[in-house]
Amino acid sequence: METIVLATSNTNKVEEFNQLFTTSAATIVSARAYGGMPAVEETGRTFQANAYLKAAALSQKLKKSHWVLSDDSGLEVDFLKGAPGIFSARYAGAQASDEENVEKLIDALKGLPKRQRRARFRCV
């Protein structure tokens, strides 16, 4: 059976990917199984670029001995012209919690009628 290492330490993501691959002969494991993710500065300007940075960093750490899969995701709000987008996890600051990011987003949408609060979650 083939093992694919997911470039994340998020156990929920590993479970989600394993559900997607139920008919596959591959098993998805977290980077934690190999000592965790190396530090990756997400400097890409797109979700695809940041996903590539994560996959490349983990692949290099594993010395290209395993298949590596990565993703990047975020919330795109129409009124905010696609923001927070690639900055969703650090929208309220580099060390911000999920709650702080949500609070900043709610503040940014204050006064906007609910029918105009359109957004999408993008994952690549």
Language model features with spans:
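Anionic-ligand binding patches
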Residues: 2-5, 11-124
